[in-house]
Amino acid sequence: MVAVVVFEFSGLRCQPLRRALRLTKEFSLYDKKIGRNDPCWCGSQIKYKKCHLFRDKQEPMKHWEVNREFNNVNSRKKCSCPDSFNENCAGNIIRAHTVPKTSSLKAISDAGHVLGLKMSYEAIRKNKGRPLLEKIGINHASTFNGFCKYHDDVIFAPLEKESFVASQKQCFLLAYRAFAREYYAKEGAQDLSTLRHGADKGKHIEAQFDIQMNNFLYELGNRAAIEDLKHHKNYFDLSLENDDFSTARAVIFTFDEAPPVMVCGGINPDFDFNGNPVQDLMDLLKRTDSLSVTSYYDGEKGVIAFSWLENSDDTCCKVMASLLDKDREDYVPIIIQYMFKNFENVFVSPKWWESESEGNRNILMKLFGDNISTDISPNANGITKPLSVYNFPQLREVITVGYPLSTEP
């Protein structure tokens, strides 16, 4: 069977298999000559002789080289504010907390530490790609080099220095902080493209093909995600520039105490809480709707917020309506499962984690594993019904902001 893959996306033409490769459905290779000066079969747009010719004889990358590049990308510095704000950037780029340190992380910490997923290359290698909650100091948990000191202070002051009253501005800022981190992470993944491309050095041709095919599909998905993020950034920037937050939407769950699970992240939901598809993430020519989830503690009450902007109403209103249609006692377990299933920027109270049964911990780690695995197809497992009962602060009220869904507290 002959397979030819040609994709056009955002002006980039990718043709990794246009020349040289004929495949069976098991992806094994048939011999076919490729000229030394032809574009390489991997889609790099580099001549074959300077790319994959004799790739099997090249020295594999050293672990320390991979770790160095990984750390360089994940420690790069930028201010994520709108371009029109750049002239006001002041002070150093700081390691901004996506989950507030003093009010939130400290509230659930034990001896200054929380449990979280370490994202360094060394940690991933040590754990063989398996998710593992490890101790992280609250000075380092949830941080990224995404804002200068001035804009981090000024933009997020209504969250950091005021009690949470579920204003549209505060709900907007919850969504914006999660969005900024996701944009930073996706740009970082794009910057690691060269590193991924060299991962097949020293390997035989069949392994080279498998690695480059996976790379190609990953790159395609990541580029699509970046285009989505650019689309949404226009809306976030416009609200900040005009100081107009009327497009912010949110469903807020408040609690008597700090949530023992802290999260800050954004997703493009593909299923609602009944397991129904709500948007097709495989349609790369269509911009997808975006939803942010944040939990934190303002010193008086715990908050878990689902927030988005008006341009994502079509999907997000369906998703949240399906959650609010559940029995009230099911809200918390489903939300906990949703956080573990969809986000890696999750931080857990060590004491809470130890208080949960081994069965509960296994359920959540299974969902966590589904989240970070590239081998598991998208599914609604864990978000349609409670898989267990978890210890959690008392749910106080449910508040909707900016759109006409209502529920009784």
Place the predicted regions along the sequence by residue:
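Composition- and surface-driven signal marking solvent-exposed, interaction-prone regions
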Residues: F54, K161-E162, V319-A321
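Charge-dense, low-complexity intrinsically disordered regions
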Residues: G221-P409
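Short Cys/His-based metal-binding microdomains
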Residues: D38-C40, I46-R55, K101-T102
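An N-terminal structural lobe/cap that precedes and organizes the functional/catalytic core
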Residues: L53-D153, A157-L159
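Internal, well-ordered alpha/beta segment that forms a basic, Gly-enriched binding/recognition surface
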Residues: G112-L217
